[in-house]
């Protein structure tokens, strides 16, 4: 199973040429604002760049190790939880409001270019040592359990209603500061 097969299934692309050697994006694909390719054993989202109108992407519970969202500037919701991501660049997604990237292998996560972010779930990224949410003033929900954070500053997140940083966060990871 791969992303290309999913896109064919949805009617977002067509294979043309000898043995489907070329692919074209269909009108339905060009207009697509939502893609849910979760739980399909997909290892790569190569081709996601051909969907610039994309607002919602759910690619959770796959085997994705890299994710290039630089050509998806309208992305509002992203769930890439349960993959093999070591890095995630959301700096080109300035209207992103919900980011779920739990259960990956992230070592860093920068959200300073996502001022509209209201939901951030980044739990179970055991190598994640730093998280700066001071540039996310609209953040209402932050779940960052089971990481390696040593400090967390939420003093700028005045809208915060839900903060989950438990499950050994303080004891196991020696949390030094929580503002």
Q: Where does each model-flagged region fall?
A:
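Residues on the solvent-exposed faces and adjacent turns
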Residues: 71, 92, 103, 113, ...
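Intrinsically disordered, low-complexity coil segments
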Residues: 15-24, 123-127, 166-176
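Canonical leucine-rich repeat
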Residues: 45-48, 67, 88, 109, ...
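N-terminal capping/linker segments that flank leucine-rich repeat
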Residues: 1-56, 73, 94, 115, ...
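Conserved hydrophobic position(s) of the canonical leucine-rich repeat
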Residues: 32, 54, 64, 75, ...
């Amino acid at each position: 199973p791969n992303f290309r097969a999913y896109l064919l299934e949805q009617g977002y692309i067509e294979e043309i040429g000898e043995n489907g050697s070329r692919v074209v994006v269909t009108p339905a694909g060009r207009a697509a604002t939502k893609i849910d390719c979760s739980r399909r054993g997909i290892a790569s989202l190569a081709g996601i760049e051909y969907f610039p109108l994309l607002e919602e992407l759910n690619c959770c519970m796959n085997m994705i190790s890299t994710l290039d969202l630089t050509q998806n500037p309208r992305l509002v919701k992203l769930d890439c939880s349960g993959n093999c991501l070591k890095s995630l660049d959301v700096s080109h997604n300035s209207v992103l409001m919900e980011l779920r990237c739990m259960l990956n292998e992230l070592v860093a996560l920068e959200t300073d270019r996502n001022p509209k972010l209201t939901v951030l779930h980044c739990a179970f990224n055991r190598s994640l040592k730093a998280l700066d949410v001071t540039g996310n003033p609209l953040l209402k929900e932050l779940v960052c359990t089971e990481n390696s954070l040593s400090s967390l500053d939420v003093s700028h997140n005045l809208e915060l209603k839900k903060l989950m940083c438990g499950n050994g966060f303080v004891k196991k990871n020696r949390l030094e500061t929580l503002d």
